[in-house]
Amino acid sequence: MMKFKWIIFSFLAVVFFISAGSTILQTKPQNQDPGVGPVKNVVLGPIDNQKVADGKKIYLAKCVVCHDLNTKKIGPPLKNIAKERMPEYIMNLLVNAVQMQKQDPFVKDLLKKYNNVLMPDPAISQTQARTVLEYLRSVAK
């Protein structure tokens, strides 16, 4: 009888940890808002190291003045943005910064927190925005 109880207990423990792990391992961001802009659907696969390298170059050239990965600067830190927002949202913010700042409620709230300092339009293409997204995905791990 004691052996049977241990088998049942072990089985239930395994089921519990598997179900708990499945929510822990989810990669979808909590917020499912795609933002305002032309990017409607981004299909993510494994991290592409070439895109990461290209995206890092763009980040260092156009973003790092205002955004650090870990600390607040003129704008918010970006290390976990790929975990917190949809890929479409991030790309739309990069390719459609002006409209996002005018229309998106989350960005409007951020502006208030950061002294209403507007993000300049980075003037990058969707292809370039995709590489920046890939870089941000790589640092969010």
PLM regions and their residue ranges:
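Bacterial Sec-dependent signal peptides at the C-terminal "C-region" and cleavage site
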Residues: 18-30
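N-terminal secretory signal peptides that target proteins for export/translocation
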Residues: 1-2
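Short cysteine clusters
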Residues: 63-66
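Short, internal strand/loop/helix patches
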Residues: 107-115
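Gly/Gly-Pro-rich "capping" loops immediately C-terminal to redox-active cysteine motifs
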Residues: 52, 56, 68-99, 116, ...
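C-terminal capping alpha-helices of c-type cytochrome domains
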Residues: 6, 11-14, 23, 89-93, ...
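Proline-centered turn/helix-capping motifs that create local helix->coil transitions or kinks
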Residues: 99-105
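Electrostatic cytochrome c docking/interface patches
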Residues: 28-58
